[in-house]
Amino acid sequence: MSESAAQEIPMSRRQLLSFVTGGAIAATTAATLYPVVLYFLPPSTAGGGEGVAAKDKEGKDISVSKLLAAATPGEPVLTLGLDVNGGDATYIVINDQKEIANFGINAVCTHLGCVVPWDNGAKQFKCPCHGSVYNADGGLERGPAPQPLALVKATVSDDKVLIAPWTEQDFRCTDLWCNKDPYWVK
């Protein structure tokens, strides 16, 4: 040990408390900012560029085998998925053969952004905010919504449902809306 190191003055109590307080503030700030930063980052994709894995209400990946075992044919299942049209609530469509359809439906109303629940009795999506009605494919049946619910592409890979942007033509056509170009693709 050199003689200059032995002559250094040890840290004072005030310096130690300042150091500990600064560390506590830095740790608290980092813990607070971590979820904020994650919010602005794009969601991780499952399986390369194939899409985002659909999640349940707890944020866990949905197992296709468990989903189909519990699903009712013709009744869509609400999941968390791709942020389309300002919201990531997405319906996975279960067809009559009890298979996952190749498309899903974004659950955000095109009028004012309310999440649209499925009415199983009427076999329609009905917006609770202002009464817009959408058919089982998300096609617009009654306004004030100006457009149908946005579509997403749904594929199955490794027992997961992958949701990706729908870029193909819109296959739905109703009396209120019949535009083949997907309005949600920018």
Curated annotation (Swiss-Prot):
Top-rank lineage group of the source organism: Bacteria
UniProt keywords, alphabetically: 2Fe-2S, Cell inner membrane, Cell membrane, Disulfide bond, Electron transport, Iron, Iron-sulfur, Membrane, Metal-binding, Translocase, Transmembrane, Transmembrane helix, Transport
InterPro entries cross-referenced by the UniProt entry: Cyt_b6_f_Rieske, Rieske_2Fe-2S, Rieske_2Fe-2S_sf, Rieske_Fe-S_prot, Rieske_Fe-S_prot_C, TAT_signal
Chain sites annotated for binding [2Fe-2S] cluster: 109, 111, 127, 130
One MF annotation (Gene Ontology) recorded for this entry: oxidoreductase activity, acting on paired donors, with incorporation or reduction of molecular oxygen
Membrane topology annotation: Single-pass membrane protein
Disulfide bond entries: 114-129
Locations listed in the record: Cell inner membrane
GO CC field: plasma membrane
Pfam families: Rieske, TM_PetC
Biological processes per GO annotation: photosynthesis
Record field: transmembrane: 16-38
Positions of the Rieske domain: 74-163
Cofactor: [2Fe-2S] cluster
Family, similarity comment: Belongs to the Rieske iron-sulfur protein family.
Main function: Component of the cytochrome b6-f complex, which mediates electron transfer between photosystem II (PSII) and photosystem I (PSI), cyclic electron flow around PSI, and state transitions.
Note, other: The Rieske iron-sulfur protein is a high potential 2Fe-2S protein.
UniProt protein name: Cytochrome b6-f complex iron-sulfur subunit
Species, as recorded: Gloeobacter violaceus (strain ATCC 29082 / PCC 7421)
